[in-house]
Amino acid sequence: MVKKKICKIDKIENNDFFKVWIEDFKDEIIIYKYNNKIYVKSAICPHFGGPISYNNDKYLFCYWHGLKFSIENGQCLNQKSFKTCLSDYLYEVKKDYIYIFKK
C-alpha cells in the first residue's frame, strides 16, 4: 500500500476543500471537510474524466455533464442509471498531518 503525506489537518476548514495531483497514484484527489469529518475521493469523474468539485450544498459535482455525487459515499445522485461511484481513498491523521493510502 502506498502512503502519501498531503497536508496539515488545520489547512481544511469545515465546508472547505482543496484538490491536489498525486503522481504516485496517477490521480487528482479532492479532500474536503463536511460536518467536521474529512473525506478523500478522486477528483476525476468516472463518467468521462471531467473535473469534480465540492459544493457545500451537500454534494460533489462534475462541471462537464452536471453529475452530482454524494459527499458521504460517492454515489451518483441525479442519474440513477449511472452506477459508478467516485473512488475513495483511505486516510489517517498522524501528528496533525493527513496521509492518504492507495488501496
Model-derived features: positions:
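Short cysteine/histidine-rich metal-coordination sites, predominantly Zn2+-binding motifs
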Residues: 59-66, 76-84
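N-terminal pre-ligand scaffold of iron-sulfur
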Residues: 1-55, 70-71, 87-103
